[in-house]
From Swiss-Prot:
The keyword Flavoprotein applies. The gene is mnmG. Belongs to the MnmG family. It is found in: Cytoplasm. NAD(+) binds at residues 281-295. NAD-binding protein involved in the addition of a carboxymethylaminomethyl (cmnm) group at the wobble position (U34) of certain tRNAs, forming tRNA-cmnm(5)s(2)U34. Keywords: Cytoplasm, FAD, Flavoprotein, NAD, tRNA processing. This is tRNA uridine 5-carboxymethylaminomethyl modification enzyme MnmG. It comes from Lactiplantibacillus plantarum (strain ATCC BAA-793 / NCIMB 8826 / WCFS1) (Lactobacillus plantarum). Its cofactor is FAD. Pfam families: GIDA, GIDA_C_1st, SAM_GIDA_C. Signal peptide: none annotated.
Length: 636
């Protein structure tokens, strides 16, 4: 075969490889910071595409979308423009686990994000496949495409998703492919291995799509959206919320014993169990055949029928991810209530792909092996659009900062769920597709859906990603919260017939002495609206998000204070830095596993070292003493 002749392409400040959810955020962030940015994608028709579930948000993930928005990212704005249904989850639980979820119009989501990218002044969007990196003396200086173009840059971000040596599997059928039958990237992985990177093989899957006209909705349970307005972005107005009658419902059905029997009888043809699939699959989103085997005692499993958009009849069968042969998939579908006559439009499939083992990354998402090279998204072993977008934003910010010769940006575990995710990846690594869960965050009471803007907008502003108008609106909100908290901390409520009648009606103890309005509001049965019956209203009408913050900050004050005290203790450990190029071989007394893990992961602080699996408190004590005594290897 004739070798493709290389030629010099344009020079850029930042190049982003891959335009999925990670790549889109990375490129927009870098460009908005003033960098001339190139965004390369295998297919222009798949920018920010949703090859799997047509939704954004959910537990932990919805909070990540709010964090992305607070930092100046795009996902929140984009889904607010393109959703077909919006629901707040876990409303019966505390604020720490509440999460917003939107059903997306997947085609509108792609089109809107592509349009946003095309309008960005510093950003060039181009179709092409990157086959290799330009690396000189351990520094990444650009990329080489399959057409021979050599584009140079000050920093490069890889967000290749599931395209890296992608392989689709449907029963006995296997072929090289990216997601949704797109072209795979077959050469870049080899180039990374040549540079010394350790790559792993992961697997994910997707369910069949069915024709919505052939679903019998009458025997399923409707799952409508919420009538009250919600949105992911600080910038979106309540007035823009789609009223309930114009939202699209999802529908709930279940597998049954017949479904399970069909699956069990065909396990000998299931790639998951025949050894065909080598990649490690996601623990928290298993295939239906995996669920039937692992949870053999369960009589049924939930399935949600979800619309893929307003202008398509394709419906997504959430919970039925599978790589079984096509004919078996059809039999499975027809065994399910409401899908007895469903026409399958696309079969489900599994896809294997390459992953950069994330212990090879810094908290900035720059690789330790190659300077100025960053990776984000499924490339780093995560699953989910939101996890990808969060990483993409951080990688794009840092690639942009590097191009501007400015210091790097990181988020701590106490700052954001994004910080929890990145710390988990770079400190612990992952042996399966990583999914964010509220249980992964030890400070989840202060990492809430409702306070993402209060936590992170200042940081977004410092990075140049929050404009003047938005920041002024944010400051007005923050000041309104402070003013009302101060006011409620000064006004007293005296016991009287009206107050005590209210308390008796709510089975609450009567007042014998006067109390501060803030203390009155701390009672579980008292809401802010109730409080306003007994005290004057605020001087200016308060927006509902201000009232929500006031109520949460007062009612959960004690718990929040305890969480903040734990954060302060963590900060002291984070302040204890581990010098670069420390020689762990020279430290006597470390346990063998701790020695191996510390040497492999190279933590930057004592706090990070303490979170590494296999490193125990005794090892941390030895390491701390070693550093305090100044017995460290010299930086070369």
């Amino acid at each position: 075969m004739t070798e493709v002749k290389q030629y010099p392409g344009r020079d850029y400040d930042v190049i982003v490889v891959g335009a999925g959810h990670a790549g889109s955020e990375a490129a927009l962030a870098a460009a908005r910071m003033g960098n001339r940015t190139l965004l390369m994608t295998i297919n222009l028709d798949m920018v920010a595409f949703m090859p799997c579930n047509p939704s954004v948000g959910g537990p932990a993930k919805g909070i990540v979308v709010r964090e992305i928005d607070a930092l100046g990212g795009e996902m929140g704005r984009n889904i607010d423009k393109t959703y077909v249904q919006m629901r707040m989850l876990n409303t019966g639980k505390g604020p720490a686990v509440r999460a917003l979820r939107a059903q997306a119009d997947k085609h509108a989501y792609h089109a809107e994000m592509k349009h946003t990218i095309e309008r960005e002044p510093n950003l060039t969007l181009r179709q092409g496949i990157v086959d290799g990196l330009i690396v000189e003396d351990g520094v990444c200086k650009g990329v080489i495409t399959n057409t021979g173009a050599r584009y140079s840059a000050k920093s490069v971000v890889l967000t290749t998703g599931t395209a890296a040596r992608g392989k689709i599997i449907i029963g006995e059928l296997m072929y090289s492919s990216g997601p949704n039958n797109s072209q795979p990237a077959m050469k870049l992985s080899g180039d990374l291995e040549r540079l010394g990177f350790n790559l792993e093989r992961f697997k994910t899957g997707t369910p069949p799509r069915v024709d919505g006209n052939t679903i019998d909705y009458s025997v399923t349970e409707e799952q409508p959206g919420d009538p009250e307005p919600h949105h992911f972005s600080f910038e979106t107005k309540d007035a823009d919320y789609i009223d309930l009658k114009h939202q699209l419902s999802c529908w709930l059905t279940y597998t049954n014993e017949t479904t399970h029997k069909i699956i069990r009888e065909n396990l000998d043809r299931a790639p998951m169990f025949t050894g065909v699939i080598e990649g490690v699959g996601p623990r928290y989103c298993p295939s239906i055949e995996d669920k039937i085997v692992r949870f053999a005692d369960k009589k049924r499993h939930q399935l949600f029928l979800e619309p893929e958009g307003r202008n398509t009849d394709e419906w997504y069968v959430q919970g039925l991810s599978t790589s079984m042969p096509e004919e078996v998939q059809q039999r499975i579908l027809h065994s399910i209530k409401g899908l007895e006559d469903a026409e399958m439009m696309r079969p489900g499939y599994a896809i294997e792909y390459d992953v950069v083992a994330p212990y090879q990354l810094k908290a900035t998402l720059e690789t330790k092996l190659v300077k100025n090279l960053y990776t984000a998204g499924q490339t780093n072993g995560t699953s989910g659009y939101e996890e990808a977008a969060g990483q993409g934003l951080i990688a794009g910010i840092n690639a942009g900062l590097r191009a501007l010769d400015r210091g790097q940006f990181t988020l701590k575990r106490s700052d954001a769920y994004i910080g929890v995710m990145i710390d988990d990846l770079v400190t612990k690594g992952t042996n399966e597709p990583y999914r964010l869960l509220t249980s992964r965050a030890e400070y989840r009471l202060i990492l809430r859906h409702d306070n993402a803007d209060l936590r992170l907008t200042d940081k977004g502003r410092e990075l140049g990603l929050i404009d003047d108008e938005r920041y002024a609106a944010f400051e007005a909100k923050r000041q309104a919260i402070k003013n009302e908290l101060d006011r409620l901390g000064k006004i007293r409520i005296k016991p009287n017939d009206e107050v005590n009648a209210f308390l008796r009606a709510h089975n609450s103890g009567e007042l014998k002495d006067g109390v501060l309005a803030a203390d009155f509001l701390k009672r579980p049965e008292v809401q802010y609206a109730d409080l306003m019956k007994f005290i004057p209203a605020a001087p200016e009408p308060l927006e509902r998000h201000v009232i929500e913050q006031v109520e949460i900050q007062i009612k959960y004050a004690g718990y929040i204070q305890k969480a903040e005290e734990r954060v302060d203790r963590l900060k002291k450990m984070e302040a204890k830095k581990i010098p670069d190029r420390i020689d762990y071989d020279a430290i006597d007394g470390l346990a063998t596993e701790a020695h191996q893990k510390l040497k492999k992961i190279q933590p930057t602080t004592i706090a990070q070292a303490s979170r590494i699996s296999g490193v125990n408190p005794a090892d941390i004590a030895i390491l701390s003493v070693y550093i305090q005594q100044g017995r460290i290897a010299k930086v070369q």
